Curated annotation (Swiss-Prot):
SUPFAM superfamilies: PRTase-like. Pfam families: Pribosyltran (PF00156). The gene is pyrR. Keywords: Glycosyltransferase, RNA-binding, Transcription, Transcription regulation, Transcription termination, Transferase. PANTHER family: BIFUNCTIONAL PROTEIN PYRR. This is Bifunctional protein PyrR.
Amino acid sequence: MKTKEVVDELTVKRAITRITYEIIERNKDLNKIVLAGIKTRGVFIAHRIQERLKQLENLSVPVVELDTKPFRDDVKSGEDTSLVSVDVTDREVILVDDVLYTGRTIRAAIDNIVGHGRPARVSLAVLVDRGHRELPIRPDYVGKNIPTSRSEEIIVEMTELDDQDRVLITEEA
């Protein structure tokens, strides 16, 4: 298996900062925002966006954690371990994930979040968009576009789990 680093730690940080600035620019009332991190790495990215919003706007935005596994249409798995401690009704919910691929995880996340209320709007922020959509889902905020073949895989590593921030691309040899 061939593995290559395509995004380093500094570029990951810059991508998250860029996403944060775009969120600030595109949302009139930042107090209505709820960041919904999709487990597992999407939660870490959501917390980093939350930190940047605090630094840049002195604003405390809530972060909720979404478990998409019980809502998947391709793989069913156990109980819902989501942590949604905020009423999302009439809020601007921004789903946050590490990689956007087929769109099935995002569809499951939408199914999950609407079970917790009726958001005014749901948008999507992803660190990496790799293409190959199977559903009509498009990200609103993108850190990096990395076109891939279907035989390749994108691996996002985050310091909280993997001891470093980077994005790898792997391909079966």
